[in-house]
Amino acid sequence: MKVLAIDIGGTKIALGNVVEGHLQHRKQFPTPVVNDATTLAKEILAHCQAWLSDVDAIGISTTGLVSEQGISAINPGTLSFPTPFPLHSELHRLSGKPVKMLNDAQAAAWYEFLQLSPELDVRNMAYITVSTGVGGGLVINQQLHKGKSNFAGHIGHTVLDPNGPLCGCQQRGCVEAIASGNAINAGAQALFGQAISNIELFQLAQHNEQASTLIQQSAEAIAQLCLNLKATLDLDLVVIGGGVGLARGYLARVQAFIDKQPLVFQVKVRAAVGDYDACLLGAAFQFEESNLS
């Protein structure tokens, strides 16, 4: 099967030509500020016009809550589209192709689960993306768990500290408000008094204790989330992805914190095999229907 895969993020939109499960071509462009889905759908199709006639279907993965009506941002700070944003229906109307849409972390969770060796006998798994925000997807009893309203897996908006920083979702102390790329970036600017990208911060952390502490705070928040999920869902595995989650040394910090806790709460973490494109590949793998609830 040939699928046009689209991954909608807070800062970029990635496009992929996925043929029989393999990413053949890829491109991306900055997420634009748009007021209607038709404008964005036309821009997306213009970027991949050379692939369009050859694909069988279009798969979308997106940050936010996905419903039949479209995309709704849980945290408007990570996605500024008006809601609900009917991108899927506009892409179908303009292209004539069948279109499916999933939350990005749910899509990545399903892709990552399908890549696991059967010998691992993983029944319950979580995927956590640490990027602009913090998202998640859950596979329970070897089925993607979305819930009645597709809200399952929004674990970035579980609260670690009720007195913590205000999140864009209007709760205080969410994992996203403590551990996300946006949170790290805000902390770095407050600490150093100037704009520092997260790439620069990770480089600085190799020899600067303050920078290292900022990253450690994020990693420990994600580790605590993993521990909580193990206690709640008896997870066999947590897969971590995203620009921050896959940054050099980050996963080791998460696992080291987990390994210091009581054994019953510990869970193995591993990097996404889809690397930075797990969500993009997950967009295409929606058409792998087996156990996709």
From Swiss-Prot:
<comment type="subunit">
    <text>Homodimer.</text>
</comment>
<dbReference type="GO" id="GO:0008270">
    <property type="term" value="F:zinc ion binding"/>
</dbReference>
<feature type="binding site">
    <location>
        <position position="167"/>
    </location>
    <ligand>
        <name>Zn(2+)</name>
    </ligand>
</feature>
<comment type="similarity">
    <text>Belongs to the ROK (NagC/XylR) family. NanK subfamily.</text>
</comment>
<feature type="binding site">
    <location>
        <begin position="133"/>
        <end position="140"/>
    </location>
    <ligand>
        <name>ATP</name>
    </ligand>
</feature>
<dbReference type="InterPro" id="IPR023945">
    <property type="entry name" value="ManNAc_kinase_bac"/>
</dbReference>
<feature type="binding site">
    <location>
        <begin position="5"/>
        <end position="12"/>
    </location>
    <ligand>
        <name>ATP</name>
    </ligand>
</feature>
<dbReference type="GO" id="GO:0009384">
    <property type="term" value="F:N-acylmannosamine kinase activity"/>
</dbReference>
<keyword id="KW-0067">ATP-binding</keyword>
<feature type="binding site">
    <location>
        <position position="157"/>
    </location>
    <ligand>
        <name>Zn(2+)</name>
    </ligand>
</feature>
<keyword id="KW-0418">Kinase</keyword>
<dbReference type="GO" id="GO:0005524">
    <property type="term" value="F:ATP binding"/>
</dbReference>
<keyword id="KW-0547">Nucleotide-binding</keyword>
<dbReference type="InterPro" id="IPR043129">
    <property type="entry name" value="ATPase_NBD"/>
</dbReference>
<keyword id="KW-0862">Zinc</keyword>
<dbReference type="InterPro" id="IPR000600">
    <property type="entry name" value="ROK"/>
</dbReference>
<keyword id="KW-0479">Metal-binding</keyword>
<dbReference type="InterPro" id="IPR049874">
    <property type="entry name" value="ROK_cs"/>
</dbReference>
<feature type="binding site">
    <location>
        <position position="174"/>
    </location>
    <ligand>
        <name>Zn(2+)</name>
    </ligand>
</feature>
<keyword id="KW-0808">Transferase</keyword>
<feature type="binding site">
    <location>
        <position position="169"/>
    </location>
    <ligand>
        <name>Zn(2+)</name>
    </ligand>
</feature>
<comment type="pathway">
    <text>Amino-sugar metabolism; N-acetylneuraminate degradation; D-fructose 6-phosphate from N-acetylneuraminate: step 2/5.</text>
</comment>
<comment type="function">
    <text>Catalyzes the phosphorylation of N-acetylmannosamine (ManNAc) to ManNAc-6-P.</text>
</comment>
<dbReference type="GO" id="GO:0019262">
    <property type="term" value="P:N-acetylneuraminate catabolic process"/>
</dbReference>
<dbReference type="Pfam" id="PF00480">
    <property type="entry name" value="ROK"/>
</dbReference>
<keyword id="KW-0119">Carbohydrate metabolism</keyword>
<protein>
    <recommendedName>
        <fullName>N-acetylmannosamine kinase</fullName>
        <ecNumber>2.7.1.60</ecNumber>
    </recommendedName>
</protein>
